[in-house]
Amino acid sequence: MRISLNWLRELVQVDLEPEVLAEKLTLAGFEVEEIEDRRTWAAGVVVGRVLEREQHPNADRLSVCQVEIGQAEPVTIVCGASNVRADIWVAVATLGSYLPCIDLKLKPTKLRGVRSEGMICSLSELGLTKESEGIHIFPEDAGLQAGQPVGPLLGLDDVVLDLTSTANRADALSLIGIAREVRALTAATLTLPEVGTADLSRTTLSWRSLYKVKPGSHYSGTIIEGVTIAPSPEWLQKRLQLAGIRTINNVVDITNYILLEYGQPLHAFDRQKLQAIAGSSDLAIGVRSAQAGETLKTLDDQERTLAEAALVITAGDCPVALAGVMGGADSEVSQETTQLLLEAAWFEPIAVRRSARSQGLRTEASARYERGVNVTELPIATQRAIDLLLQIAGGTVISQTVATTTQTEPEHSITLRLQRINELLGPVQAEDEELKDLGADDIERLLTAIGCHLTLVDDAVWQVRVPPYRYRDLEREIDLIEEVARLYGYDNFGETLPPLGSDEGALSIDESLRRQIRAVCRGVGLTELQHYSLVKPGSDRQVHLANPLLAEYSALRLDLLSGLIDAFQYNWEQGNGPLWGFEIGRIFWREEDGFFEADRMGGILGGDPSRGRWQRGGKEQAIDWYAAKGVLEEIFERFGLTIEFQPDRQDDRFHPGRTASLWLQGDRLGRFGQLHPSLCEGRGLPAEVYAFELDLDVWLDHLDQPERQVPRFQPYSSFPASDRDLAFFVDQSVTVAELERIIRRQGGALLSEVELFDQYCGEHVPENQRSLAFRLTYRASDRTLTEAEVEPVHDQVRQSLVERFRVTLRS
């Protein structure tokens, strides 16, 4: 925002040099990006009176002028402007002056044989316009005097501060807001503009107080008749130009002036045009959401098709403006306008943001509404605009009607503790360079300076009532503490280190386990991935954002698997080969009784990640189901956990015959399997890609057990083992996991290993059965087992398989 220092000094009596003031504002969080000192643009430039003008003897396009500039004798100046003539007031750059905008230092020179002792300037040469058709000529009735500086006449006696503020400071987008800030930083006197009271005793039946106001809105309309549209007075034009706003006419310029001064967007409609649009003199103004397919031609001459997210102002239910963004071209103020409807409104920031985004249109008005306009000052800003309109454009106020549905509470109270302030901010540097804590007097002085009202409710505890113009950014105690630090000056706090206790810096058990899991996954060859939690909507179970930045990222993810598949596909299409990766993240979903979230771990792997294919004649050797399963098992073996695989067909993205649910000591852990062939074919992926998604909370619960906190070494047995092979026919519906569970249970402490080493389906095998062969290893840690010890246990295993699964023993 561009701030005129002269305008600012009318509101707050500050005599600091621009550089000093800029530094104070920057340290307080308002970064001054540029100091535009316009006083240097016209240093040495004075008002001159052209006494005579003669044709240059040696050039057709040059004139020789005698110009009075307040010196003893007129000076001779050669001028090339076509509009120079005698008896006009002009701006003259005297000898020795420097014009920074054109990088020119004036010195005596000869032009085609005639000596010139200065230069008659155009506005472009003084930096006021980009181009000029000739020299600038002052009005005859300006009461000028030869030799007086031109700076005050052209607004070149001012300094402009170009500053930016943080997004939470809605009040900083107004000159009064900056003036309040300067008052707080310098203890200067603040003087706000005087606002009169309009005579609203007259009413008119042609105005009907019928408002269809959208919840969360405040809307007032003031009818003014008998206005005269004309150029704005020079002082108003200068202030708008200094702020970087183009002048249009007196009415529009006044609304822009209030926008800069109070930060309150206003809009002036041509009332008669509104009546024509509505088709009735009985005017009904409304605020509603646009209907899909409605169109509106805005002031930038763009015909816009409105989305349902757009908020519109209506006349007779016909859209006439984008609420809080831009007015409509069909109701704009023109030279023929004599009746106005002055709109002053407060809209929900979210509603304006959606409306502006739906049209790809951001304006000075929408920028302020999006941050939050101070609704309590809306009547003051409206009356200030009415005062200026009556003063500059004439007319009579006929009526004013207000409709509101806003529930916004512009003032609220916050509990503030002195102890908490000093705990967070630490001591300050005193004048004697000793460190001391902030006192109660300091807190009251600083917060009172920004408009807060403090009531002491306990020993060094206040109830702080926040001013309405700061209700958007001062919401919690920590916000007030930040204000104390900002106003006192960050550089005035002492340099201290926080005390460290013996327990400081330790990782929580949960975080430590997560890091171990990540390290193990990297150790087995998986790369850690990270995806956005925001995804494209497509399911009723998704949690949808109330105010999304983009429609493609307007919902929260239901799982990690979708992102992992997308990442695998992207890497494959980019020629980077198969992706072996894992991700730890949070998923979200909704149910009838509310919203839920949980931590998950997912992974994906497939294809042939190996190198040295030349040894296989260039043939790929893709990882198979058992190898992928082995990667997952190795991860759990590193933590001393054994997982159980059971058939699973609940997710259509997985192969129905090569998918398993994972169980950990009776708790469902997740799912692992091969992606469905149709999914891989549709995405152009390798034929065999495997993925898993695990409930991280279940995993961490099993790891966070006292017996697992400290690793224990189990010595290897130094005694020989006794192996037994067990072969049998079994129904194909029986899983190997079920068989292994029974074998281990019956084998007891003596059974150390169970390994499936053969499977056969074919000739000589009964129908719907298969032949399986297991190798059972029996071992004791303190002795060599004898046949008498092994055989009874082994027979018990065999008998249990026959009884439980009706197997046909072959050995």
Swiss-Prot record:
UniProt keyword annotation of tRNA-binding present: yes
Cofactor binding notes: Binds 2 magnesium ions per tetramer.
Segments forming domain tRNA-binding: 39-151
One GO MF term attached to the UniProt entry: tRNA binding
Listed name of the protein: Phenylalanine--tRNA ligase beta subunit
Example of a GO biological process term: phenylalanyl-tRNA aminoacylation
Cofactor(s) needed for function: Mg(2+)
Gene Ontology annotations for the cellular component aspect, listed alphabetically: phenylalanine-tRNA ligase complex
Domain B5 stretches: 409-495
A Pfam entry, by short name: B3_4
InterPro entries membership: aa-tRNA-synth_II/BPL/LPL (IPR045864), B3/B4_tRNA-bd (IPR005146), DNA-bd_dom_put_sf (IPR009061), Fdx_antiC-bd (IPR005121), Fdx_antiC-bd_sf (IPR036690), NA-bd_OB-fold (IPR012340), Phe-tRNA-ligase_IIc_bsu (IPR045060), Phe-tRNA-ligase_IIc_bsu_bact (IPR004532)
Keywords: Aminoacyl-tRNA synthetase, ATP-binding, Cytoplasm, Ligase, Magnesium, Metal-binding, Nucleotide-binding, Protein biosynthesis, RNA-binding, tRNA-binding
Catalysed conversion reaction: tRNA(Phe) + L-phenylalanine + ATP = L-phenylalanyl-tRNA(Phe) + AMP + diphosphate + H(+)
Gene3D superfamilies registered for this protein in UniProt: 3.30.56.10, Bira Bifunctional Protein, Domain 2 (3.30.930.10), Ferrodoxin-fold anticodon-binding domain (3.30.70.380), Nucleic acid-binding proteins (2.40.50.140), Phenylalanyl-trna Synthetase, Chain B, domain 3 (3.50.40.10)
EC number per UniProt: 6.1.1.20
Family: Belongs to the phenylalanyl-tRNA synthetase beta subunit family. Type 1 subfamily.
Subunit note: Tetramer of two alpha and two beta subunits.
Compartments where found: Cytoplasm
UniProt domain FDX-ACB: residue ranges: 717-810
Keyword Secreted in record: no
Residues the record lists as binding Mg(2+): D473, D479, E482, E483
Superkingdom of origin organism: Bacteria
